[in-house]
Design a protein with these regions (language model features):
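N-terminal FAD cofactor-binding segment of flavoenzymes
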Residues: 53-112
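FAD-binding beta-loop-beta segment adjacent to the flavin cofactor pocket
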Residues: 317-338, 343-347
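Glycine-rich FAD pyrophosphate-binding loop
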Residues: 37-58
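Beta1/beta-strand and adjacent pyrophosphate-binding region of the FAD-binding site
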Residues: 11-28
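An active-site-proximal "capping" alpha-helix that borders the catalytic cofactor pocket
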Residues: 68, 351-371
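Predominantly flavin-linked oxidoreductase catalytic cores and closely associated redox partners
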Residues: 146-303, 360
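Feature captures the FAD/FMN-dependent oxidoreductase FAD-binding
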Residues: 91-190, 194-195
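Active-site-proximal substrate-binding core of FAD-dependent oxidoreductases
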Residues: 362-415
Length: 562
């Protein structure tokens, strides 16, 4: 493991000392820095750019919401809860955030109008919270300033030139000659990681099965899809497409439409727009600008194009090569390659921030304990490497299966349900840990216990059944991809897997292929809890029963959990 290098020369008159140096002040770096500083560490937070600034990762998920709760409660950083919902972001940060009431998916074929029967939607239960479309320049700037208020030394427009590690720590030297001496380094800088470059950590090619590249920017004037779809009212979903994250699915790719103007109190006219597609099927042209290329694909899909009539781009395009990258490892002597600095799959399903904050949770207490014990043995941090690897592995499996299925609606309808079936128990196990923490005098052991699971990185890592369901789905989709199965055969296999699995919740409609719009009501949630506590398999009954009893106890004690 390339983790130690000769000691760097020190100049005690110039080198500034800290406990932790954080490279990158996006949400990953700023939240980590705020947590560490709030809990007594001396932290430097530096970035080559400055706030406010554009960032991708704008769509929230139920699991992300729960991780935000956990980080705020466990590490006593209440400002993190300002990201919990569109109401909270609007109140605490500003009126620039959209609402996310659903994940919406519509299948498109070239030069054809989309069939309204080839659409799926998952509505997020109102019982939880009204998630936000995060306007990242505001959310990231907010958390950066939270970190500063907790005492972090900050540097903007500050580019690291050298990282020199030895047994006792790391010396970080900027291009301006300024030097810092730290006991531990977190690299949260993303793909262009100086740490990954220094230790040659990138795997070539990336180890993942999935392939995609992306074009993205911000627009004003994007029309709601509801206004241009031309679909009859009786075939439309229960929640307007414009009220959530819209995914326009094409063969081996998808357009995203993430509006920031869809919340009643928003004053933000912008809409995030992107196209992510398999670079092997859609090679990057050398003779087109990103805008010309994007418009070429818009011309192929008339209903999507109608959303752009009269709209105007307000940012330069970002045009990537292959998005997927991976690292040999993400933990070494006195350093961590965090989340998007370690690897990336695809923005589909908006897993990025949820995965990031799961890593922040696992890393932060280990650093605080290491500072207290003055013991930074790599072994103390090995779980973080295992976690980052597992999160990427299972996400790769799901996203690759999904891209394969986009060419055949029946198969997509099946894969959509596998994804959906993973969400609720994944959130429930986190809620259970938070309930235990609150009811047991804020004992952090209940969060540490989450790590004792056989399938690290899976949404419900204790579940052999969900792991088997996901693996069988991936195997089936791969057989369809190479022609061993046709689309109907592959879809039928996945639907049988769903039907036969006792761990898949039947009350939402995941087992019914005719129910394309999943919109849990309060009554649906009551029926679900009855199934989870009385009719589900033992592991689900245990999870459901403890959540229900914990919520009742917490409510009786006046603790607000949701």
């Amino acid at each position: 493991m390339p983790s130690k290098v000769p000691a760097a020369p020190r100049d005690s008159g110039k080198v500034q000392h800290c406990d932790v140096f954080v490279l990158g002040s996006g949400l990953a770096g700023s939240v980590s820095a705020a947590i560490l500083a709030r809990n007594g560490a001396k932290v430097v937070l530096a970035d080559a750019a400055a706030h406010p600034r554009f960032a991708v990762g704008e769509s929230m998920t139920p699991q992300l919401v729960e991780w935000l709760h956990i980080l705020a409660d466990r590490y006593d950083v209440p400002e993190i809860k300002s990201l919990l919902s569109v109401q909270a972001t609007t109140r605490d940060i500003g009126p620039h955030f959209g609402t996310k009431q659903h994940f919406g998916f519509m299948l498109h074929r070239p030069d054809q109008e989309p069939d309204p029967r080839e659409a799926t939607q998952l509505v997020l239960p109102k019982l939880l919270s009204q998630a936000a479309h995060l306007f990242r320049q505001d959310s990231d700037s907010y958390m950066f300033h939270v970190a500063a208020r907790y005492g972090c030394t900050t540097r903007q427009n500050w580019r690291a030139a050298d990282l020199a590690f030895d047994d006792d720590g790391v010396t970080v030297t900027g291009q301006n000659g300024e030097a810092f001496r730290a006991k531990f380094l977190i690299d949260a800088s993303g793909f262009r990681s100086l740490l990954a470059e220094k230790f040659q950590l990138r795997e070539t090619p990336a180890r993942f099965n999935h392939h995609s590249r992306s074009l993205f920017t911000h627009y004003v004037g994007i029309k709601p899809f509801d206004d241009v779809s031309r679909h009859p009212a009786e075939l439309r979903p229960p929640v307007p497409w414009h009220n959530g994250t819209m995914h326009h699915l094409i063969d081996r790719g998808w357009f995203w439409i993430i509006p920031f103007d869809n919340y009643k109190d928003s004053r933000n006219p912008l809409c995030s727009v992107g196209l992510t597609f398999d670079e092997r099927v859609y090679p990057k042209p050398a003779d087109l600008t990103p805008e010309e290329e994007f418009n070429r694909y818009l011309d192929m899909f008339p209903a999507v194009k109608r959303q752009f009539a009269g709209a105007h781009r307000v940012r330069e395009w970002v045009s990537t090569d292959r998005l997927q990258y991976s690292s040999t490892h993400s933990i070494g002597h006195r350093w961590c390659l965090m989340s998007h600095a370690a690897g990336f799959i695809d923005p589909l399903y908006s897993r990025g921030l949820s995965n990031t904050f799961e890593v922040v949770n696992a890393l932060s207490y280990r650093i605080l304990d290491a500072l207290k014990d003055d013991d930074f043995a790599v072994e103390r941090f090995e779980y973080v490497d295992e976690l980052e690897r597992g999160l990427l592995h299972f996400n790769d499996m799901l996203v690759n299966s999904s891209f394969i299925s986009f060419s055949h609606f029946k198969l997509w309808n099946a894969v959509f349900r596998v994804w959906g079936a993973l969400i609720t128990p994944g959130v429930m196990r986190l809620t259970r840990a938070r309930l235990r923490f609150q009811l047991d005098n804020k004992n952090p052991q209940h969060f540490i216990d989450l790590e004792n699971a056989p399938h690290t990185g899976l949404w419900w890592p204790e579940s052999d059944k969900l792991k088997a369901l996901l693996e069988a789905t991936a195997e089936t989709c791969e057989k369809y991809e190479v022609g061993e199965l046709d689309g109907d055969e592959a879809a039928n296999i996945v639907f049988r897997l769903l039907q036969d699995s006792d761990i898949v919740n039947p009350t939402f409609g995941w087992k019914d292929p005719r129910k394309r719009f999943i919109a849990p009501t309060t009554m649906t949630m009551i029926k679900f809890m009855h199934w989870a506590t009385r009719q589900g398999p033992p592991e689900m009954r245990e999870l459901g029963d403890e959540n229900l009893r914990g919520l009742i106890r917490a409510t009786a004690k006046g603790k607000k959990l949701l």
